[in-house]
A protein has these predicted regions:
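Extracytosolic ligand-binding ectodomains
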Residues: 1-205
Length: 205
């Protein structure tokens, strides 16, 4: 999923946003963030044919709350897009602080932003942020998706976040493996998991 998100994000920045200059701000203590940033950079450079298109790269650690130093440095390069794959709390704070500094670049992030808490932390500042995700709850894509959406809404009286769909699918994959293994023994279940084919979950096949 990370290679897909990184390359799609880069393609969107280049093809749809017509970005010429991109800055990266990474959660350097998070392998997810570092990996996603690398996939994005590699693909954007490939598309643009210009290694200098990545005008700045800044790092921070999980739990940081003040990003003024990184953002002040980024601002001087006037990027069109800032790719900021990280946890939703830090990412929302980054965007808020960027707007306070007068940075107008479009922000792109990964699926960790696809949660209501991102909007709660970021408020109006995160409006217009671009998010890649593996699940959309507006239109069911198959019967499993339809059943999941109905059950979640009936139980919790709200829309499900993408992570809930992923957890639901993980449960279904294991349940399917147990049935095919006809056993509760871990080794047999593991073997059945490796043989899973054409699984249709709420987030797709």
């Amino acid at each position: 999923l990370d290679p897909f998100q990184g390359t799609v994000g880069a393609a969107y920045a280049f093809n749809e946003l017509k970005a010429k200059k991109v800055a990266i701000i990474r959660e350097v203590s998070n392998d997810y963030s570092v990996g996603l940033a690398k996939f994005f950079v590699d693909h954007f450079v490939k598309l643009s044919g210009d290694e200098k298109a990545i005008v700045a790269t800044a790092d921070y650690n999980t739990g940081d709350q003040d990003f003024s130093a990184q953002l002040t440095n980024i601002k001087q390069f006037e990027p069109d897009v800032i790719f900021a794959p990280g946890n939703y709390t830090e990412s929302a704070l980054i965007i808020k602080q960027a707007r306070d500094l007068g940075i107008t670049a479009k922000f792109i992030g990964g699926d960790t932003w696809d949660i209501n808490a991102f909007l709660e932390v970021g408020g109006a500042a995160v409006e217009g942020a671009i998010v890649s995700t593996f699940f959309a709850n507006d239109v069911p894509i198959n019967k499993t998706s339809e059943a999941f959406l109905k059950s979640f809404r009936d139980e919790y009286k709200k829309e499900p976040p993408a992570v809930a769909a992923l957890g639901y699918d993980a449960y279904l994959v294991v349940l399917d493996a147990i049935k095919r293994a006809n056993s509760a023994e871990p080794e047999k279940i593991r073997e059945a998991l490796t043989q899973t084919k054409d699984f249709e979950g709420s987030a797709g096949s």
